[in-house]
Amino acid sequence: MYRSTKGASKARRDQINAEIRNLKDLLPISDADKSRLSYLHIMSLACMYTRKSVFFSQDITTASSAEETTGFLSFYELNELIQGMPGFLLLLTGEGKLLYLSDSVSDHLGHSMVDLVAQGDSVYDIIDTADHFIMRSNLVPPTSPDTDRLFRCRFNTSKSVRRQSAGNKLVLIRARCLSQTPSESSPGSYWTSNPVWVCFCAPLEPHTSRGGTASDRESTSASALESSFFLPCFRSQHSRDMRLHEAQESVSVYLGLNVEILRSQSWYSFLHPQDLSHASAQHCSLLREGGEGRAEMVVRVETADHSWVWLYMVLQLETGETPIVSNNYIISETEAWSVRQQLSSEQTQLSLVLGSSTSQQESVSLQSPETLSSPDQVFTPGSSGLSGQSFDFSTAACSTGSTEEQGGSSSMEPAQVESGPRSSLSSMEEETFFQHEPSEPMASPSSASSPIPVTVATVSDLDFLTQNILLPPAFQIDPPLPVLPLPLPPVPTSQAQQTKEFVCTPPYTPQLGGSNFPFGEPHFSFDPTGATSPPPLGQTATVTTTTAPSLSPSAPSNPQSSPPPPTTTLSSLLPLTITSPTTEILFPVEPCSGSLYEKLPPTPDSPGDGDCTVMTLPEVRGPLYVDVPHGPLPYPPEGLLTPEASPGKQPSLPFFSSLRDREKERTEISLLAQHISTLAEGFYLDPLLAKLVPSTLSEHSQSPDSDGLDSIPLLGEFYPLKSWKGLDLPIFQDDESLFEESVLETLLQDLSSSPPLSPTPSSSSHSSPPSSPSTPECWCPSLHFDGVSAVSAGHFCSVQSAHCNNEAGRGAMMSPVNAGNMTDTKAAGEVPMETDVASSPLFTGIPTSPPLQLTASPASPILMPVSSPVSPPSPGLPCAQSLLEELAALEPMFGAGASIAPGLGQQPELYQLQSHVPQQCFRKDGSGSDPPF
């Protein structure tokens, strides 16, 4: 059975291989190519030639008469014509299946058609993967009478798809659709849904190297000019400033201008005004050192009859007196749409890969102008004019500019954006861009006036923030201070020049509801033209120190409805004056400011390459946080969510503070410590005092002080919970000090209204003397104040560490009570905590003692020695708790008054965990405590 099955399989394979060999003999290729084909290669070529034969035979059969067939070229004539073409011919269907690939492809791509189509019969197998979308979008069936398409594509120059090391070559493709109408073909025909495209491909890169000889350059130009067979073209030579020197005589046919007229004027004088920026940017990229020496542009050129002709120019930088050689292709508006959109998308992708920002003006120029109409949905851009993701940089310069010092002058020129080697200006525009023209101050900016000298003594008292953030770099400091690099301030110019200057597009999310960048609030603006105007209301010419008001972070604001912050304008008649040293923070008053950290420049860890990182943050002792409002929001909060810390971890933790706030906080802490020390001394009196106090006074302490209970407000209802704060205090003022003082006053009044300490009468027959000093007693911390929330108790200062040891040696008398007190005290609104000393692991081997119950009530804490068989006290009887346990339990909540912040390198959320103080053992003789370990 197995032998027969194995033999049948082998017989079938032999039969299939024989048929494939028969197909190889039928292929119209040379015997040398046939001998090196594999079975898969044979099948791929057979499919391609079969599709071509079916398509052309269908065209011949649909001819109405024999006279029409005689008008076609014969096979040999067509073959000679194709071989004489400058490029190569490509026929393919709408889905990318190849029908024909001329043999002349080997002259341009370096490999024959058999080598390129060996492992696939699709055009996507021989082009670069980055251009698959471009090819697919241009093979969409046309929806307009114009069936011509012009686009660029990179073809692989390797034999196999698996070998990509050989690179690729850029080819200009002009495609024409040969689709048939439904009446000419059957409704279910394959060619109805897959129209055939004939593509004339002309390589845009020359065959010779960049530094070839003159004869090689002439042969290269001659071969390039032959591409006008399917695309009108003329060749021209230019100097480094793009002034034309030589041009082909056919330029008079396309432009109506002879070579002498073109030679007498600059090339930029013939360009459309809307295309000047795009042309100058490509010109600069061509002359950039270290570049590839090649550039492309799509511009409109004025003809002799004052009309506009679209030119697709491919510029190549070579050596010699006229180093720039340009092949100029005359294209239509539809083709200009396609090529220009393709250039724009490629430049955007390149800028994202290289991490450099593209020019805003260039992105506008790369979009189609308003005069063009979209001929096809394929070439319709997403939006006309500025895109929705553009940023408004009319108020601040975020680009990394380079200042140049010319002629030993001390004046600083405005920053030039390095979209090319230096800027996006042409060589002629650079000569007149910074010239002073008083008659047109807004149309052409003038040179910046000499800066005001500022010495070190003048700014010695300014803090780090002022010197590095608010002091503009145009001010010369002698000797210079070690400040961070800053961009030059914005120059008020025309809209076209503003978009040319402020071109940095940061990789961040713009503010909600607007296109303003969060770092765009200016502090200084300069008017280099010298034209002065009275500043509007709210603007000053003096650098003043302001403090932003405190706003609730939970209330989201609308950036659109808020007015812009007042800026400081500096002109020649309004000199900059530095005020006296102060401790205020130099920030503008903003009605919708949520946190100062949102307005700071990005840090080195921020996403992006650093083009928009105008400076680095000063070293801050503490974690950085972003203020994020609580509660659900219908949209993300305004400002920037930086990756330094998660905004959900800790809300609203500012880290900049002034020296005055620090001193005020220290004073409040010291006063609070004194008050609590005085309060603690009232709790811990001498144990013998209870014997001297008359027992009749204890009757007043049996009922809680209801008046004091009512006098304490429920502060937790109107004052939010305070979270931990860093070492640096907030610059916004709050009612924290008032709140702490009110709590202290309430507690002091409550204590003053309570009677003196007295032993609680229980049962005279069951009274027992105090326990021996050798018997240890456990102090168990518990926390509850009737009528006072945990927030109020959390404002105690952490002085218990110093006061506990002082009071521990004085001894205390605890009251062991029955376990039934728990239910009674719970009914009274108290939260007791029971601790059995015998069951505690800390007291193994120590004589046990009755269980203790410690509670705290609004009345005065009383220490009462009671024997173990005591009847349950009344619900209103208060049980005492020492201040030691209260303060020990309140220690984790002490963050509102004290400045306890995590150190460098520690996680901030660890300081939000509540620390549990271990139980401590004290002896009545005051000998101290035994360590639990």
Swiss-Prot record:
Subunit annotation: Efficient DNA binding requires dimerization with another bHLH protein.
Domain of life of the source: Eukaryota
GO cellular component terms given for this protein: nucleus; postsynapse
Residue ranges, annotated region (Disordered): 361-451, 514-573, 750-776
Major localization class: nucleus
All residue ranges annotated as the PAC domain in the record: 295-334
Tissue: Brain-specific.
Record-annotated PAS domain positions: 74-148, 220-290
InterPro entries linked: bHLH_dom (IPR011598), bHLH_NPAS4 (IPR056192), PAS (IPR000014), PAS-like_dom_sf (IPR035965)
PROSITE patterns linked: BHLH, PAS
Ranges for domain bHLH: 1-53
Provenance organism: Danio rerio
Location of the protein in the cell: Nucleus
Alphabetical UniProt keywords: Activator, Differentiation, DNA-binding, Neurogenesis, Nucleus, Repeat, Transcription, Transcription regulation
UniProt-annotated stretches for the region Basic motif: 1-13
Job description of the protein: Transcription factor expressed in neurons of the brain that regulates the excitatory-inhibitory balance within neural circuits and is required for contextual memory in the hippocampus. Plays a key role in the structural and functional plasticity of neurons.
Composition skew (Low complexity), residue ranges: 399-411, 440-451, 538-560, 751-769
Any one of the GO BP annotations: regulation of transcription by RNA polymerase II
PANTHER family: HYPOXIA-INDUCIBLE FACTOR 1 ALPHA (PTHR23043), NEURONAL PAS DOMAIN-CONTAINING PROTEIN 4 (PTHR23043:SF24)
Gene from which the chain derives: npas4a
Protein name according to UniProt: Neuronal PAS domain-containing protein 4A
Residues covered by region (Helix-loop-helix motif): 14-53
